[in-house]
Amino acid sequence: MMVTVIGAGSFGTAIAQVLSWNAEMVRLMARRSEVVENINRTRENSAYHPGVKLRDNIEATLMDGSVLEESEYVFMAVPSGNLRSIVRSMNSSLEDKKIVSCIKGIEHPGLKTMSSVIREETGSRTVFSISGPNFADELIRGMTSGITVGASTRYAREIAGLLKSPRIILDHSENVEGVEFCGILKNVYAVAMGILDGQITGENHRHSLLTLCFREMNLILNEMGYGELHDRFCGFGDFLLTSTTDKSRNRTLGLMLGKKMRLSEDSTITIESLRSIRAIRELTEGLELPVLEMVYQTMQEPENVNLYIREFQERISRPEF
């Protein structure tokens, strides 16, 4: 089977390497010709994974819908803010494909998951998602990783066949958007743990805050009808990894906010995090979510972070009973 990965960034390249063990050929689509030429010439994506050799059955190519003709499955790994325009540019080539979103983000305004955007633009009825606690630099090196496949059982088995490896642990949910929603939420709460890091007095404190964050995330999942996903790789696993590890871009963003460091307002991670936080806040209007509110206020007025942390600490110190 031939498979295409759209997006030759860090995760797109990593998932292409994973897929290459089971697919006959993997096409890795990039936007820039110099990236395509460099990957095919050196067998590396030196911008993201220097020193990691890509397998011989991975071929880089420019983004062009005609390249998709022979592919049964297409994995999407592009920034969430660019997804709609990229899909729109090749939608007639995607309408009969099985499409797997690897993207952790939400469209705002519009409040649509990535699979919803893909379905809307292509008309495809076979759109799925994968998510889990996966840093791309470990995934591409074959280190053990857990992935949740969001698809009906029939298609989940096909996707599992493409991902299978002694070092890939899979679980499954038929709730495609729920799997995606976990990936959106965990990013928000990873920012929270980063913001609060400077206030943590010890491990008791750290894990109490982790519990509060996960409880709040669970409350939102239940409210959205996705409560069964909290113990999947896309739920607890991804939350724990992203909230406690300094390799996490969202946790790092929170650390910078907590230290009042100047942020680049046009950086991808800042834009995507703010988009996700605003979207979740709109979707959960009416719920009492002190962690989310603290993150939202801090992102809006980072110079007042100490005030918002103090208000949050006062709120959580009041007994719930």
UniProtKB/Swiss-Prot annotation:
The gene is gpsA. It comes from the Archaea. Gene3D superfamilies: N-(1-d-carboxylethyl)-l-norvaline Dehydrogenase, domain 2, NAD(P)-binding Rossmann-like Domain. This is Glycerol-3-phosphate dehydrogenase [NAD(P)+]. One of its GO terms (cellular component) is cytosol. NADPH binds at residues 10-11, 31-32, 104, 136, 249, 272. InterPro entries: 6-PGluconate_DH-like_C_sf, 6PGD_dom2, G3P_DH_NAD-dep, G3P_DH_NAD-dep_C, G3P_DH_NAD-dep_N, NAD(P)-bd_dom_sf. Glycerol-3-phosphate dehydrogenase (G3PDH) is generally absent in archaea, because archaea, unlike eukaryotes and eubacteria, utilize glycerol-1-phosphate instead of glycerol-3-phosphate for the biosynthesis of membrane lipids. Surprisingly, the genome of the thermophilic archaeon M.thermautotrophicus comprises a G3PDH ortholog, most likely due to horizontal gene transfer from a eubacterial organism. It comes from Methanothermobacter thermautotrophicus (strain ATCC 29096 / DSM 1053 / JCM 10044 / NBRC 100330 / Delta H) (Methanobacterium thermoautotrophicum).
